[in-house]
UniProtKB/Swiss-Prot annotation:
The keyword Nucleotide-binding does not apply. Pfam families: Beta_helix_2, NosD. It catalyses: Produces alpha-D-fructofuranose beta-D-fructofuranose 1,2':2,1'-dianhydride (DFA I) by successively eliminating the diminishing (2->1)-beta-D-fructan (inulin) chain from the terminal D-fructosyl-D-fructosyl disaccharide. Keywords: Glycosyltransferase, Lyase, Transferase. InterPro entries: Beta_helix_2 (IPR040526), NosD_dom (IPR007742), Pectin_lyas_fold (IPR012334), Pectin_lyase_fold/virulence (IPR011050). Its EC number is 4.2.2.17. It comes from Arthrobacter globiformis. This is Inulin fructotransferase [DFA-I-forming]. It is an enzyme of class 4 (lyase). GO terms for molecular function: glycosyltransferase activity; inulin fructotransferase (DFA-I-forming) activity.
Amino acid sequence: MANTVYDVTTWSGATISPYVDIGAVINQIIADIKANQTSQAARPGAVIYIPPGHYDLLTRVVVDVSFLQIKGSGHGFLSEAIRDESSTGSWVETQPGASHIRVKNTDGNREAFLVSRSGDPNVVGRLNSIEFKGFCLDGVTDSKPYSPGNSKIGISVQSDNDSFHVEGMGFVYLEHAIIVKGADAPNITNNFIAECGSCIELTGASQVAKITNNFLISAWAGYSIYAENAEGPLITGNSLLWAANITLSDCNRVSISSNKLLSNFPSMVALLGNCSENLIAANHFRRVSGDGTSTRFDDLFGLVHIEGNNNTVTGNMFSFNVPASSISPSGATPTIILVKSGDSNYLATNNIVSNVSAMVVLDGSTTATRIIYSAKNSQLNAYTTSYTLVPTP
């Protein structure tokens, strides 16, 4: 059996230094893996190790083999936005560290890593058990709101895949940090993603994703977490700070629980289209005024926005503290929860604390909404008579 552990700094088959173009080196290693693992029944994959250091990536990496782990020794995050807004003459360090890859993309491609296999997955099979762990992807230069920004993508998965993992990574100054299409049981955990246009996006369709224990910070123009046509994701234990935004489009049976959301914009959790049987529970929503701008939503959109049926919002803490002069549209009463459409949605034991009058709103198209200890009589604005209210005492 050929060696299955590769160090990008010592592998003898490289034709270029990894410090000059780590993308080219990793592509050469993947070619070596494929050349040495040719039996259908014996393809164990490999580990590609990136020791601590600063590496430039000029060439996009294309991952088209299963059971590949690309790992470093630390996520190495450093806030480049704070750096770029500061006088750094006396700073000890001004670059991200640990296993640090500068995504320069001089080959004309947007992605640092493209996970893609040619051929119909029903014929050639899915890509299985690919892991990215413990290194930093740095887009080098960017500015708020980071989208379209520098147009760079950290990791893009564009083939159907099973058990895809991203763990302990750092992402900074990218338009899109992670995009995963056609995912079955992906696990995205313990990452530090900040100063990117969007952090985590599940596109196409996915099932039983886990998005847990991540720091997702300053996704000003995009999404902290986005999923479409997803079945059964678990989104828990994340800290979403500044422009916190979880948006689900046509998703079912999602559990959004025990997350900390701090945002200076509305739409902290949005269920769009036809979203059903989702659970939003035991989260802390804190809405404040701060830097950054957004024209996507005004304060009538709701911190939680619901379109769909049989969704449950329960046991959440809503802390709203925005100067009246900063509320949009001017003079409006802000909405905490908006049930925009759907039948039999359930709001229970949610606590609202606000420095101004704030409302739970039911659109005229909604039916059979149940509201239990989630609004006082004075906090409910219903454009329908099809609801049940047990007011907060």
